[in-house]
Swiss-Prot record:
Catalyzes the transfer of L-fucose, from a guanosine diphosphate-beta-L-fucose, to the terminal galactose residue of glycoconjugates through an alpha(1,2) linkage leading to H antigen synthesis that is an intermediate substrate in the synthesis of ABO blood group antigens. H antigen is essential for maturation of the glomerular layer of the main olfactory bulb, in cell migration and early cell-cell contacts during tumor associated angiogenesis. Preferentially fucosylates soluble lactose and to a lesser extent fucosylates glycolipids gangliosides GA1 and GM1a. This is Galactoside alpha-(1,2)-fucosyltransferase 1. It is a single-pass type II membrane protein. One of its GO terms (biological process) is positive regulation of cell-matrix adhesion. It comes from the Eukaryota. Belongs to the glycosyltransferase 11 family. Glycans are attached at residues 66, 302, 328. It comes from Aotus azarae (Azara's night monkey). GO terms for cellular component: Golgi cisterna membrane. Its EC number is 2.4.1.69, 2.4.1.344. Residues 26-366 are lumenal. The keyword Aminoacyl-tRNA synthetase does not apply. It catalyses: a beta-D-galactosyl-(1->4)-N-acetyl-beta-D-glucosaminyl derivative + GDP-beta-L-fucose = an alpha-L-Fuc-(1->2)-beta-D-Gal-(1->4)-beta-D-GlcNAc derivative + GDP + H(+); a ganglioside GA1 + GDP-beta-L-fucose = a ganglioside Fuc-GA1 + GDP + H(+); a beta-D-Gal-(1->3)-beta-D-GlcNAc-(1->3)-beta-D-Gal-(1->4)-beta-D-Glc-(1<->1')-Cer(d18:1(4E)) + GDP-beta-L-fucose = alpha-L-fucosyl-(1->2)- beta-D-galactosyl-(1->3)-N-acetyl-beta-D-glucosaminyl-(1->3)-beta-D-galactosyl-(1->4)-beta-D-glucosyl-(1<->1')-N-acylsphing-4-enine + GDP + H(+); a neolactoside nLc4Cer(d18:1(4E)) + GDP-beta-L-fucose = a neolactoside IV(2)-alpha-Fuc-nLc4Cer(d18:1(4E)) + GDP + H(+). Pfam families: Glyco_transf_11 (PF01531).
Amino acid sequence: MWPLSHRHLCLAFLLVCVLSAISFFLHIHQDSIRHGLGLSVLCPDRRLVTPPVAIFCLPGTPMSPNTSSPCPQNSASLSGTWTIYPDGRFGNQMGQYATLLALAQLNGRRAFILPAMHAALAPVFRITLPVLAPEVDSRTPWRELRLHDWMSEEYADLGDPFLKLSGFPCSWTFFHHLREQIRSEFTLHDHLREEAQSVLRRLRLGRSGDQPRTFVGVHVRRGDYLQVMPQRWKGVVGNGAYLREAMDWFRARHEAPVFVVTSNGMDWCRENIDASKGDVMFAGDGQEASPWKDFALLTQCNHTIMTIGTFGFWAAYLAGGDTVYLANFTLPDSEFLKIFKPEAAFLPEWVGINADLSPLWTLAEP
């Protein structure tokens, strides 16, 4: 056997060092390589086909109804990233959430909500969509799409992997095929449901003192709509005559109903709703900054009377039962009808009562 030269020994030592270094490198990066992220380590200048998605693992936001873990097991398997810009008030953001969920499922994409929407909805509902981190939102190459408020054929074939929706969608045509899933997403937290049911249990019919068996939630939208509807949209809000007719509709069809009135104008309601029959309860607190108490009350009722607005829509949609709504509440030439289709806003089985537009005709006179 030929003795190894000093040069051969040096080369062998260098080879062992190189192999050891490669082995160590592969060991420390084995998890990344196994989950598809090793490509960015080995070839940092090459774009990943599916970039990693960061989320907030916030308390009370499980990834799916069937898991108790708030964090995903494998975010690299996601197909695209869709979100929606949170805008407007409580009912608006419920509509945006439901529409995002439905359109993302329809197009085979993964839906995420932004932190502001989580802050608005998670204290009230057991929502399950994960939350997109701001740093991911800021560096994602979004294509933006503003939605109108009814389902369109083109929304069923959106090929964009990174899509940020916007607008004020709140039409059943987007999500009604997923009604049970939507109702599950908007399940009240236990303490809110129990508090609302406790209020209803304490109610008594004024004349007999009996506990009512049929509760009709009444939502009367006032506030800024008193100016916005006539001045901007050539429209009206529900008046006392409409509410009286709607209540009489329920009195004719249900035995001894009690009407649970909520509003952001409770003083007006007490002055304009006839409570002499003993079946009207002014139960709402009218706090616009914390609407969930009134909303919880409405959803625990059997039926609904709504005026206008997304808050009333969602109360009726989640409560089920019969719903009476204010119909034809704008003039025929209102710009509002360009962004609002009544047939897409109200379920076909709901009952509409025409609004009194005479105050608008008076305003239109020279």
